[in-house]
UniProtKB/Swiss-Prot annotation:
GO terms for biological process: lysosomal protein catabolic process; protein catabolic process; proteolysis. InterPro entries: AB_hydrolase_fold, Peptidase_S28, Ser_carbopepase_S28_SKS. Homodimer. The gene is Dpp7. Plays an important role in the degradation of some oligopeptides. Glycans are attached at N60, N96, N325, N366, N373, N438. Residues 34-36 form a propeptide. This is Dipeptidyl peptidase 2. It is an enzyme of class 3 (hydrolase). Keywords: Aminopeptidase, Cytoplasmic vesicle, Glycoprotein, Hydrolase, Lysosome, Protease, Secreted, Serine protease, Signal, Zymogen.
Length: 500
């Protein structure tokens, strides 16, 4: 196993490792002197097995798994390893939105590693074909976890720190993976911070109405009038459609194409509903650019836009523009290009990463969420197990296994695990699908008041609610304790006492 583009030198140590070792002395001094916490990540590729669990089909074939590494704050031989378990996206985007981990590395003198998930970003087992039908068979949670485990072992071996305590970090699906790493590979990972990790929902154990009910609650909490206006806008669109006033809908909402079929209406409803999902998840108290550029407090801004228009459908258009037309340069909404329906009703996005996530939502990740216009403010859009199964057969030729995560990763019964923090924000619609109470003295659940999707993983900001400041302090304390405990558990070197 090696790394690209660097090649091993004569003694078998990859050249990137030599660079890392040569710079350690300087970096250890800078860790306390630098006032700006830029981790100076370096991008590398690791030769990863394509298939960890089959010795025949792919033999020893490998692909390049991308990872980012920073030793800027690391005290070699004493500092831990902070290992981010990448999720459904480009690893640079995830690293750039996880500043708390960098801050914590500076405090605790840790080596930083951000590992990209197979089939996402540039970690493509079959190149550009990877997310096409017929090439996705190696995209599983288990394969991704094995990637992380093999990479971590190789890093520790190459750096000569086989006993360095490692803490896994992740947010959302990545938070699930960080918890799973602690559960499946406890000899490698001493603890995990699983931020906004919906481990219950994805195992098929949640309420299918919960997600969009909680999105609605965010907007109702901002303004009951806003939530009612959303209901009114969707009802007006439906009424106009039933009257055959397709051009009126297109003109008022601003679609590039006129609606002409029930399929178009469902697509429009999904397109608009997705905008609310994004705003609720990204409801941070300062401007961000994670899923796209958004202003501070986007739920509040969205409601203001909606209510500022006298015509409700035009108000809905103004709100959707926060997500789909942040530049203000789009003349209209291409509802089929900007939003693609998939096996995740909360949205897959577009492009290669979206196709990979759609496949995962068709196999192991169970996301059968409905909106019903009773417990939520959205049009009735069902997504049952039966509808999911048919979609996945048609799209990928696969049968979902709705109960598999309960079997493989315990569902919500995690009492036998240890050293995992499950953090959730009370504004995050994913929180209801996660662990929200302590399961033991070391399976800890914390709630961030005024917190959106994995707010605690983001860099400190002067606009942060007081709750997230306190939660980060708790997380830092627990992680420091886990690292110290892992050090104490390391076996002492055997001493040969000599002949009696």
């Amino acid at each position: 196993m090696g790394l690209h583009p660097c090649s091993p030198v004569d003694h078998g140590v990859p050249s990137w490792v030599l660079v890392l070792l040569l710079t350690l002395g300087l970096c250890s001094l800078q860790a306390t002197a630098d006032s700006v916490l830029d981790p100076d990540f370096r991008e590398n590729y690791f030769e990863q097995y394509m298939d960890h669990f089959n010795f025949e089909s792919f033999s020893n074939k490998t692909f390049g798994q991308r990872f980012l590494v920073s030793d800027k704050f690391w005290k070699m031989g004493e500092g831990p390893i902070f290992f981010y378990t990448g999720n459904e996206g480009d690893i640079w985007s995830l690293a750039n939105n996880s500043g708390f981990i960098v801050e914590l590395a500076a405090q605790q003198e840790a080596l930083l590693v951000f590992a990209e998930h197979r089939y996402y970003g540039k970690s493509l087992p079959f190149g550009v074909q990877s997310t096409q039908r017929g090439y996705t068979q190696l995209l599983t949670v288990e394969q991704a976890l094995a990637d992380f485990a093999v990479l971590l072992q190789a890093l520790r071996h190459n750096l000569g720190v086989q006993d360095a305590p490692t803490i896994a970090f992740g947010g959302s699906y990545g938070g699930m993976l960080s918890a799973y790493m602690r559960m499946k590979y406890p000899h490698l990972v001493a603890g995990a911070l699983a931020a906004s990790a919906p481990v219950i929902a994805v195992a098929g154990l949640g309420n299918p109405d919960q997600f969009f009910r909680d999105v609605t609650a965010d907007f109702y909490g901002q303004s009951p009038k806003c939530a009612q206006a959303v209901r009114d806008a969707f009802q007006q669109i439906k009424d106009l459609f039933l009257q055959g006033a397709y051009d009126t809908i297109s003109q008022n909402f601003g679609t590039c194409q006129s609606l002409s079929s029930p399929k178009d209406l469902t697509q429009l409803f999904g397109f608009a509903r997705n905008a609310f999902t994004v705003l609720a998840m990204m409801d941070y108290p300062y401007p961000t650019n994670f899923l796209g550029p958004l202003p501070a407090n986007p739920v509040k801004v969205g409601c203001e836009r909606l209510l500022s228009e006298g015509q409700r459908i035009m108000g809905l258009r103004a709100l959707a523009g926060l997500v789909y037309n942040s530049s203000g340069m789009e003349p209209c909404f291409d509802i089929y290009q900007m939003y693609q329906s998939c096996a995740d009703p909360t949205g897959c996005g577009t492009g290669s990463n979206a196709r990979a996530w759609d496949y995962q939502a068709c196999t192991e990740i169970n996301l059968t969420f409905d909106s019903n216009n009773v417990t939520d403010m959205f049009p009735e859009i069902p997504f049952s197990d039966e509808l999911r199964q048919q979609y996945c057969l048609d799209t990928w030729g696969v049968w979902p296994r709705p109960d598999w995560l309960q079997t493989s990763f315990w569902g919500g019964d995690l009492k036998a695990a240890s050293n995992i923090i499950f953090s959730n924000g009370d504004l995050d619609p994913w929180a209801g699908g996660g662990i929200q109470r302590n399961l033991s003295t070391s399976i800890i659940a914390v709630t961030i008041q005024g917190g959106a999707h994995h707010l605690d993983l983001r860099a400190s900001n002067s606009e942060d609610p007081p709750s997230v400041v306190e939660v980060r302090k708790l997380e830092a304390t627990l992680i420091r304790e886990w690292v110290a405990a892992a050090r104490l558990k390391q076996p002492a070197e055997a001493q040969w006492p000599g002949p009696k």
